[in-house]
Amino acid sequence: MRCLPVFIILLLLIPSAASVAQPKTKDDVALASFYDNAKRTLQRHWAKSLCCPEDAWCC
C-alpha cells in the first residue's frame, strides 16, 4: 500500500514529461520572436539611459 501513492504520482508525471518533448509549433515561434523583440527594445532603451543620464541629447 505504500507504493500506491508513488505509483499514482509517477503516472501523473508521465504525460507532462511527454508534452515538453514536442516540437515547436508556428505559434511558439511567433511568441519567441515577440519576446526577442521585446527584449531587444528594452536593452536599447536601457543602453540609452546609461549612456548619458543628465544629457539626453548626446545619445
Swiss-Prot record:
Known tissue expression: Expressed by the venom duct.
Signal peptide: 1-19
Entry PTM: Contains 2 disulfide bonds that can be either 'C1-C3, C2-C4' or 'C1-C4, C2-C3', since these disulfide connectivities have been observed for conotoxins with cysteine framework V (for examples, see AC P0DQQ7 and AC P81755).
Propeptide residue span(s): 20-47
MF term (GO), any: toxin activity
Major location category of this protein: secreted
Coiled-coil segments on the chain, per record: none
Description of its domains: The cysteine framework is V (CC-CC).
Protein name: Conotoxin Ts-03
Organism of provenance: Conus tessulatus (Tessellate cone)
Lineage: Eukaryota, Metazoa, Spiralia, Lophotrochozoa, Mollusca
